[in-house]
Regions:
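Aromatic pocket-lining residues of Rossmann-like dinucleotide-binding sites
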Residues: 37
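Class I S-adenosyl-L-methionine-dependent methyltransferase module
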Residues: 40-148
């Protein structure tokens, strides 16, 4: 378990054959290794059901559909549109407004459990991570960036 991005920076991809027919990513996680490997076919797997649903999402929907859904949720819930560190904001009320918008959207997600909303939530959650409590509710706090 861990961040494979560091391994990629250290040259992991260069260790792979140049012509890969089928790349099997058994413990894919974020799929960063798969996304940085050229192959004719990919098999991506992970034990986490939420990640599996994301893999299906990316296969099922085109980028514009996903982006339009994210934009609609940003507008609907008043989520931050700009990418700004919270500590750079002069207006402290704006920080609270964005934090409350995130919490409202998180609450909505926990009631409806839509994978497109799950993906959107991760943009705004702390360190773009996800975590669930014992009841299965998404419980990551709002991230340090207003839009991450």
């Amino acid at each position: 378990m861990g961040n494979k991005k560091k391994l990629i920076k250290k040259g992991l991809i260069e260790l792979f054959p140049k012509n890969i027919d089928c790349f099997i990513d058994v413990f894919a996680g974020s799929s960063i290794v798969s996304m940085n490997t050229k192959a004719n076919k990919y098999f991506i797997n992970d034990v986490d059901i939420n990640l599996k649903q994301l893999y299906v999402l990316f296969k099922k929907y085109d980028a514009n559909t996903i982006i339009n859904h994210i934009k609609s949720r940003i507008d609907e819930y008043g989520l931050a549109k700009e990418r700004t560190k919270r500590n750079e904001f002069k207006d402290k009320n704006k920080i609270e407004q964005y934090k409350n918008a995130y919490m409202n959207f998180r609450s909505y997600y926990n009631t409806h459990k839509n994978v497109l909303d799950f993906y959107t939530l991760m943009f705004y959650s702390f360190s773009q991570q996800f975590r669930f409590n014992n009841k299965g509710d998404f419980n990551m706090p709002c991230g340090n960036d207003c839009f991450s």
